[in-house]
């Protein structure tokens, strides 16, 4: 159900995007909503998965079928919920996660929020041999020149996105200082830089 949603990308938030189609705005939870920033106000196709809970029906969206499949594999693991799976995919490509699983790299997996040693081991036990490494994932970025005011906004929005993924304000304090020393061409780029810092 809801294999994908195709329509105009109207809004970006730290945890989700809104896609309007046939007069209806669909709220879609994504690993890194700012990945779609360059498509704002344009038509997009987002691969989706609907998860029904007792208190809500949530639509999760991804930039590729590979990312969606990795998400669906991760949430089958005991101890991994949608939020943890999104946090993993916000930082890593599907192939990077698959390599960590195949190489039994528990240390890599414990870098993500909410993933302890026990859960990392469970991911490996449940998914090793079941995930296939595909051709390299591609994620293009729109390169634009940004003003200093835009730079501040990029960093602020990146911090909100990182906090939404489950990282604490204490963990992010040093990250924010480092981000402010550099220049970024988009929120997505700042988020990726922040994610690399927080898991390093």
Curated annotation (Swiss-Prot):
Keyword Metal-binding: no
Residues covered by region (Flexible linker): 143-149
Domain of life: Bacteria
Record keywords: Cytoplasm, DNA damage, DNA recombination, DNA repair, DNA-binding
One Gene Ontology biological process: DNA repair
Region span, Domain II: 64-142
SMART domains: HhH1 (SM00278)
Listed GO CC annotations: cytoplasm; Holliday junction helicase complex; Holliday junction resolvase complex
InterPro entries, per database record: DNA_helicase_Holl-junc_RuvA_I, Hlx-hairpin-Hlx_DNA-bd_motif, NA-bd_OB-fold, RuvA, RuvA_2-like, RuvA_C, RuvA_C_sf
GO MF annotations in UniProt: ATP binding; four-way junction DNA binding; four-way junction helicase activity
Region of interest called Domain III, as start-end residue ranges on this chain: 150-200
Subcellular location: Cytoplasm
Region described as Domain I: 1-63
Biological role stated in the UniProt entry: The RuvA-RuvB-RuvC complex processes Holliday junction (HJ) DNA during genetic recombination and DNA repair, while the RuvA-RuvB complex plays an important role in the rescue of blocked DNA replication forks via replication fork reversal (RFR). RuvA specifically binds to HJ cruciform DNA, conferring on it an open structure. The RuvB hexamer acts as an ATP-dependent pump, pulling dsDNA into and through the RuvAB complex. HJ branch migration allows RuvC to scan DNA until it finds its consensus sequence, where it cleaves and resolves the cruciform DNA.
Subunit structure: Homotetramer. Forms an RuvA(8)-RuvB(12)-Holliday junction (HJ) complex. HJ DNA is sandwiched between 2 RuvA tetramers; dsDNA enters through RuvA and exits via RuvB. An RuvB hexamer assembles on each DNA strand where it exits the tetramer. Each RuvB hexamer is contacted by two RuvA subunits (via domain III) on 2 adjacent RuvB subunits; this complex drives branch migration. In the full resolvosome a probable DNA-RuvA(4)-RuvB(12)-RuvC(2) complex forms which resolves the HJ.
Protein family according to the UniProt entry: Belongs to the RuvA family.
Record's comment describing the protein's domains: Has three domains with a flexible linker between the domains II and III and assumes an 'L' shape. Domain III is highly mobile and contacts RuvB.
Protein name, per record: Holliday junction branch migration complex subunit RuvA
Gene: ruvA
């Amino acid at each position: 159900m809801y294999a994908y949603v195709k329509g105009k990308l109207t809004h970006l938030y730290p945890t989700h995007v809104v896609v309007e189609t046939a007069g209806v705005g669909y709220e879609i939870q994504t690993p890194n909503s700012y990945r779609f920033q360059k498509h704002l106000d344009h038509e997009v196709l987002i691969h989706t998965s609907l998860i029904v809970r007792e208190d809500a029906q949530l639509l999760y969206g991804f930039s590729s079928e590979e990312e969606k499949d990795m998400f669906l594999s991760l949430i089958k693991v005991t101890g991994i919920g949608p939020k943890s799976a999104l946090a993993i995919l916000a930082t890593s490509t599907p192939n990077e996660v698959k390599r960590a699983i195949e190489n039994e790299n528990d240390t890599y997996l414990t870098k993500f929020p909410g993933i302890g040693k026990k859960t990392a081991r469970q991911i490996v036990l449940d998914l090793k041999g079941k995930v296939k490494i595909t051709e390299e994932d591609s994620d293009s970025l729109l390169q634009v020149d940004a003003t200093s005011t835009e730079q501040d906004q990029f960093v602020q929005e990146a911090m909100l996105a990182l906090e939404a993924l489950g990282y604490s304000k204490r963990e992010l304090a040093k990250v924010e200082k480092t981000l402010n020393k550099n220049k970024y061409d988009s929120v997505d780029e700042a988020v990726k830089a922040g994610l690399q810092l927080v898991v390093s």
